[in-house]
């Protein structure tokens, strides 16, 4: 899915290897692939294990964090998905929180958030989704781009919020399952 997002945005995905112990990319595995053509770095916080972000941020590129598998994971005192330029979360059925389909975005960049809001609702300009603009002449808005509707419905959003409130319980169960796998597979020489 990460590669798809890059391709759909008109970019070229350049893959790098991962660390054998964490299954995450590292600054060392990313570095050989940085070039004058690099526009951003996308990292995946895999299986709840955060990517070491400081070395990745030191490249000076925008960093997109896929934090779908690390919704409640922290690096220091910062949650995964809140460290880079943009955090993205898939709510697919196999992710830590599911709404059936869909996802979420976090960013501190107001221009990027405005653009994300425009794109999620058929490319409607910012006045089309601001509550103040909806009170009068709500039918007047600009279409600034052509894009499919990507808004979650209320039922899906409610399911996601209910699961978010139970994230600690979910993580405890996942850790128990992880420990069972670790114990059962410990004797295998990989």
Identify the residue ranges that each predicted region occupies.
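Short, well-ordered alpha-helical microsegments
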Residues: 1-3, 49-50
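Surface-exposed charge patches
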Residues: 4, 54, 183
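Hydrophobic/aromatic ligand-binding patch that stacks against planar heteroaromatic rings
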Residues: 4-6, 79, 155
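Structured binding elements
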Residues: 10
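Short beta->alpha connector loops at strand-helix junctions that form conserved
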Residues: 15-19
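Active-site region of PLP-dependent enzymes
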Residues: 70-76, 83-190
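Active-site phosphate-binding strand-loop segment of PLP-dependent enzymes
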Residues: 21-99, 104-114
């Amino acid at each position: 899915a990460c590669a798809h997002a890059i391709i759909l945005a008109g970019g070229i995905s350049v893959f790098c290897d991962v660390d054998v112990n964490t299954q995450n990319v590292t600054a060392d595995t990313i570095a050989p692939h940085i070039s004058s053509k690099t526009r951003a770095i996308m990292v995946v916080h895999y299986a709840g294990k955060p990517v070491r972000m400081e070395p990745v941020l030191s490249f000076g590129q925008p960093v997109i964090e896929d934090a779908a598998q690390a919704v409640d994971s922290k690096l220091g005192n910062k949650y995964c998905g809140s460290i880079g330029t943009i955090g993205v979360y898939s709510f697919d059925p196999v992710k830590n929180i599911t709404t059936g389909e869909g996802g979420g975005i976090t960013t501190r960049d107001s221009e990027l958030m405005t653009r994300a809001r425009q794109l999620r609702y058929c490319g409607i300009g910012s006045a089309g989704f601001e509550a103040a603009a909806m009170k009068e002449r709500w039918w007047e808005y600009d279409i600034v781009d052509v894009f499919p509707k990507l808004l979650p419905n209320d039922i899906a959003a409610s399911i996601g919020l209910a699961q978010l409130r139970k994230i600690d319980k979910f993580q405890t169960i996942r850790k128990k399952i992880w420990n069972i796998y670790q114990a059962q597979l410990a004797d295998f020489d990989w």
